[in-house]
């Protein structure tokens, strides 16, 4: 069941309604106005005789890539959403850093190098931009729900991971637990290089040579996202090492990848959310899994959030889910710089920007790209390009003049989808 969310005259959230006829009459009689189209929210322009709100519980399934959020009241799902987070922040900042360094090399070639002069790096409790985005996305979704619904309680599914134990499961034994956390892979060695050579028995791992000059080689290069982890390092002789870089030797060794970034991010997200919402109730993943199995429900982020908010009790499903995706706020490279009396570009072509929500032949899309010739490339909320090859001639590539803009670009794209949840 789809709901219309209601805000009182003084800005306080009220219980949502499914009486669309009454909402239509209020809008026609100028007793209410539209605040938001997705999700559809109205604000009353008069004081009702009585304001009664019920208890609404907000449940959130925290995550490093996706967030599931649900609000449950009177054993009914009043709101449910699934947010896809950004994963391009680090790569974009790496590109910025590379361009900045190359620019300074060109512009100030003979100037003494400067480094460690960033004020932001000296801030107390500073978070990396990629982690800060994920924490802020969780907070934004909670605050959004509190604006449209009278949330009285917050339940968070959070987790805390022991990354040392994930890398070395033997730390679970009491006999080595008290000292194992202080002794890593290269403990007792002067450098990681010596530890790698000792692990590989001072022998080339391709040809088996010994008693020769040995090199420690990155299996996945640092330029391709490789790390200095011991699983990514291998011992090679000088001939095999130069042969790999010359393309004459192929390294077939597979590394055991243990990606600990999501686990680290989840631990940080937990601590930050509990600092912002100290009254929130914590729950764990195995509790949600048990409740899902008891209710015979499939695994999904928004269904997990519904189970978290309901506390494992039965509830009435909502057939509307709000799919959201976080995107950059703007294309800043197009709008910055000293320009004198030149007009500052705003990144618009015929009043359209990238990520604008538009309507084309009755369906809603987002702008993926624009052409100065007046055409556009459209996509869905999951960044999939829409193919219009089935359209008649003249409409296979959408024209900007045929598009109707629904909403301007925002940092969070949103679209409503009708679903039929499978409870088999």
Regions found by a protein language model. Give the residues of each.
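Short beta-strand-centered aromatic/proline hotspots
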Residues: 356-357, 363-377
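Histidine-centered nuclease catalytic patch
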Residues: 205-238, 242-249
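Charged, flexible boundary elements
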Residues: 13, 17-51, 185
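Short metal-coordination and nucleic-acid-contact micro-motifs, chiefly zinc-binding Cys/His arrays
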Residues: 4, 55, 197-201, 212, ...
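Gly/Thr-rich phosphate-binding beta-strand-loop-beta motif of the actin/hexokinase/Hsp70
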Residues: 54-73
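A short macromolecule-binding patch
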Residues: 79, 383-400
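Substrate-contacting helices/loops that form the catalytic groove of nucleic-acid
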Residues: 51, 72-183, 187, 251-354, ...
């Amino acid at each position: 069941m789809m709901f219309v969310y209601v805000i009182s005259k003084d800005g306080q959230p009220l219980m949502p309604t499914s009486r669309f006829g009454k909402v239509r009459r209020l809008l026609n009689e100028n007793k209410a106005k539209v605040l938001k189209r997705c999700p559809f929210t109205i604000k009353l322009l008069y004081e009702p005789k009585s304001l009664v709100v019920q208890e609404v519980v907000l449940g959130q399934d925290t995550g490093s890539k996706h967030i599931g959020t649900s609000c449950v009241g009177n054993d009914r799902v009043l709101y449910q959403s699934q947010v896809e987070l950004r994963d391009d922040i680090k790569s974009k900042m790496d590109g910025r850093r590379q361009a900045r360094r190359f620019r300074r090399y060109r512009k100030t070639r003979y100037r003494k190098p400067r480094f460690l002069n960033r004020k932001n790096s000296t801030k107390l409790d500073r978070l990396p931009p990629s982690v800060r985005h994920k924490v802020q996305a969780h907070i934004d979704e909670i605050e959004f729900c509190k604006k449209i619904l009278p949330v009285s309680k917050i339940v968070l599914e959070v987790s805390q991971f022991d990354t040392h134990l994930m890398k070395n499961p033997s730390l679970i034994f009491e006999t080595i637990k008290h000292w194992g956390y202080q002794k890593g892979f290269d403990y007792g060695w002067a450098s990681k290089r010596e530890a790698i050579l000792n692990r590989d028995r001072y022998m080339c791992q391709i040809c088996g040579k010994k008693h020769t000059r040995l090199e420690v080689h990155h299996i996945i290069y640092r330029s391709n996202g490789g790390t200095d982890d011991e699983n990514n390092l291998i011992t090679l002789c000088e001939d095999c090492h130069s042969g790999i870089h010359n393309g004459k030797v192929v390294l077939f060794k597979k590394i055991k990848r243990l990606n600990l970034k999501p686990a680290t991010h989840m631990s940080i997200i937990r601590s930050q959310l509990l600092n912002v919402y100290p009254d929130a109730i914590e729950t764990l993943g195995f509790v949600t899994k048990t409740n899902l199995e008891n209710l015979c429900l499939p695994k999904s982020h928004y269904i997990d959030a519904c189970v978290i908010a309901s506390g494992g009790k039965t509830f009435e499903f909502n057939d509307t889910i709000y799919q959201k995706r976080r995107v950059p706020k703007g294309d800043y490279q197009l709008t910055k710089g000293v320009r004198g009396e030149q007009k500052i570009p705003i990144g618009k072509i015929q009043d359209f920007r990238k990520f604008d929500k538009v309507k084309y032949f009755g369906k809603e899309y987002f702008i993926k790209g624009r052409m100065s010739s007046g055409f556009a490339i459209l996509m869905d909320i999951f960044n999939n390009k829409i193919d219009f090859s089935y359209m008649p001639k003249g409409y296979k590539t959408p024209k900007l003049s045929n598009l109707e803009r629904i909403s301007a670009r925002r940092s969070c794209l949103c679209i409503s989808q009708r679903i039929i949840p499978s409870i088999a």
